[in-house]
Swiss-Prot record:
UniProt protein name: Large ribosomal subunit protein bL12
Taxon lineage: Bacteria, Pseudomonadati, Pseudomonadota, Alphaproteobacteria, Hyphomicrobiales
UniProt family annotation: Belongs to the bacterial ribosomal protein bL12 family.
Cited CDD domains: Ribosomal_L7_L12 (cd00387)
Gene: rplL
Gene Ontology cellular-component annotations: cytosolic large ribosomal subunit
Length: 125
């Protein structure tokens, strides 16, 4: 434990430039990247304010209205979700309901296009 206490004392005495150099050396030695943690540590309280400005990476595909071609929408919901006929029909009739949750932007856009082509109204959240 005495060795760990000495390491902590030595690290506490480093300047900001020395700490940055240490970080780079450790990244090279261990083959990792500390980009996000360093940015959060450097930004401090500003990180919380910047969080809403970050681009979302996960989206929910929400069916808001089945439209006039409900059968086509049910077919697309089944294809997207893998649900059975009854479950897909119940989901479509209970709109607004999420069809897929936590999907990538590319997948969300693809699912939205498929559902809209079938006659549904869809939102991405």
């Amino acid at each position: 434990m005495a060795d760990l206490a000495k390491i902590v004392d030595d690290l506490s005495k480093l300047t900001v430039l020395e700490a940055a150099e240490l970080s780079k050396l450790l990244e090279e030695k261990w083959g990792v990247s500390a980009a996000a943690p360093v940015a959060v540590a450097a930004a401090g309280g500003a990180a919380a304010a910047a969080a809403p400005a970050e681009e979302k990476t996960e989206f929910d595909v929400v069916l808001t209205d089945a439209g006039a071609q409900k059968i086509n929408v049910i077919k697309e919901v089944r294809a997207i979700t893998g649900l059975g006929l009854k479950e897909a029909k119940d989901l479509v009739e209970a709109a607004p309901k999420p069809v897929k949750e936590g999907v990538s932007k590319a997948d969300a856009d693809k699912f939205k296009a498929q559902l809209e082509a079938a006659g549904a109204k869809v939102d991405l959240k």
